[in-house]
Amino acid sequence: MVRKNTSYLMENSEEALRLELKTDPEAVRGQAVWCGVQPGMHVLDAGCGPGKVTSILWDMLQPRGRILGVDYSEERIQYAKKHYGNRSGIDFRFHDLRHPLDAMGPFDLIWVRFVLEYNRIESFEIIRNLDAVLKPGGSLCLLDLDHNCLSHFPLPAHMERILFELMKLLETRFNFDAYAGRKLYSYLYDLGYDDVALHLLPHHLFYGEVKTEDVFNWVKKVEVVSLKAKELFEDYPGGRGGFFEDFKSFFLSPRRFTYTPLILCKGMKPSLP
């Protein structure tokens, strides 16, 4: 039986900072153009985190565009309101996407980026909830990673084994989905969406020296996640601390090659008959 923990896997005191630093505005804008974000639209940023991406999308929606960011972290909604909520046409609201979005919308476009990977069991339920507040003829845009955090070379075999065991444990204990990206097409297909299209991009592509913000992001991820599965490191030389130091050494080596694919999937909600 799956043991489900409904808390956010990456919750920590620096999560808003991590999410801010890892967001590449140029990459977000390129993805949004592919998704069809245009001025004047009414958009929902589903799972907005600290609001940086919502703010980038707001810029692209002007003039006369509006965007609502929702998230199930009250702390990050307050952060978003403080840092990005002082402009007309942008708003933030606390809401758990696993529940219906009553009295919201309807929206021209719904943006769902890096959300479903943290909600493995409820992913399709979330999609159905979003579909209910999307206008007929509106666009649903799903963006998520696949084979998340698992593609590295030359990672020693004993470290690679720990990483795969860790991801399996996070799946069963914390509802995390390292393979969320490959499932996006099936969601829109099953809902009968029109004009479904997909695109594949490298989200992480690391070789040689790595930018400081990427080092912070990956080291923080390994630090937070490894604390949730200490038993996996009992037989590792030096325990969890030993693994953490070995991974940092590997990741900081300019010989390391690491990549993670990002899958983008968009479709149009069928118009009313």
Predicted regions and their residues:
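Class I SAM-dependent methyltransferase Rossmann-like catalytic core
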Residues: V2-E26
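C-terminal helical/coil "lid" or tail adjacent to the Rossmann-like core of SAM-dependent
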Residues: N5, E14-E15, H199-R256
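Conserved alpha-helix/loop element of class I SAM-dependent methyltransferases that forms part
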Residues: K22-P39, I56
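Class I SAM-dependent methyltransferase SAM/SAH-binding core
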Residues: L44, P50-P100, E125
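Helix-to-beta-strand junctions that scaffold the AdoMet/dcAdoMet cofactor pocket
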Residues: Q62, N119-R120, L134-P136
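A short acidic, Gly/Pro-enriched loop at the edge of an enzyme's catalytic core
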Residues: D102-I110
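A short glycine-rich, Lys/Arg-flanked "PGG" loop and its adjoining helix->strand segment in the class I
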Residues: F124-S139
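Conserved catalytic/acceptor-binding region of the Class I
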Residues: C141-V210
